[in-house]
């Protein structure tokens, strides 16, 4: 799943229609709740190292609404969200979702199945997923390739 930058209206990148990951260099991306040693933390650490920005994990993780409130009010913090993830926020938040391209960072997902599962839909799903190719250049960490 492609990721996007989510910012408030006062963030320096808020007016961008799209960004490259390299354009995030020097910025702080707030990801509260990322726990060291998890695949999610490793993904974001590798992404930050590849493109020169900082992943900020400090602060409490009280859920989506407080995260959106903080991002809306901050001129310095942004966060990452999945392109397919839908949020509802108050209109006065004026949050901005900015796609990342060249390359597009994508969350690594895996399909795990049991070899003894004969369900025909599973074979059809695997065949379908094997035909999908991204329309743009993508970035995933080396350990997920």
Residue ranges and their predicted role:
Residues 1, 16, 26-27, 51, ...:
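Structured helix-beta-strand junction loops
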Residues 1-3, 7-29, 123:
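Flexible hinge/capping segments at coil-to-helix
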Residues 3, 29, 76, 134-137:
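Generic structural signal for secondary-structure transition and capping sites
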Residues 4-6, 12, 78, 96, ...:
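Residues embedded in well-ordered beta-strands
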Residues 7, 31-33, 81, 113-115:
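Short beta-strand/turn micro-motifs composed of small residues
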Residues 17, 21, 27-51, 119, ...:
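Secondary-structure junction motif
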Residues 32-98:
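Hydrophobic hinge/microswitch elements
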Residues 68, 72, 83-93, 102-145:
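C-terminal effector-binding regulatory domain of bacterial HTH transcription factors
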């Amino acid at each position: 799943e492609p990721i996007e930058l989510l910012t408030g209206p006062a963030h320096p990148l808020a007016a961008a229609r799209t960004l490259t990951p390299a354009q995030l260099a020097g910025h702080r991306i707030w990801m509260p709740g990322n726990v060291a040693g998890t695949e999610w933390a490793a993904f974001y650490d590798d992404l930050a190292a590849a493109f020169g920005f900082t992943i900020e994990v400090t602060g409490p993780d009280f859920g989506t609404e407080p995260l959106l409130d903080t991002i809306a009010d901050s001129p310095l913090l942004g966060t990452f969200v999945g392109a397919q993830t839908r949020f509802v926020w108050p209109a006065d938040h004026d949050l901005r979702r900015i796609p990342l391209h060249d390359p597009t960072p994508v969350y690594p997902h895996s399909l795990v199945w049991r070899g003894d599962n004969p369900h025909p839909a599973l074979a059809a799903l695997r065949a379908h997923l094997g035909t999908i190719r991204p329309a743009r250049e993508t970035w995933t960490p080396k350990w997920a390739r």
